[in-house]
Amino acid sequence: MAKEKIRIRLKAYDHR
């Protein structure tokens, strides 16, 4: 599922 990929992307994006 892409949900897991989105979660990882969100986590990396939240690493501002």
UniProtKB/Swiss-Prot annotation:
GO cellular component: a single term: ribosome
Record key words, sorted: Ribonucleoprotein, Ribosomal protein
Keyword Ribosomal protein in annotation: yes
Assembly mode: Part of the 30S ribosomal subunit.
Family: Belongs to the universal ribosomal protein uS10 family.
Biological function: Involved in the binding of tRNA to the ribosomes.
Protein name: Small ribosomal subunit protein uS10
Originating organism: Geobacillus stearothermophilus (Bacillus stearothermophilus)
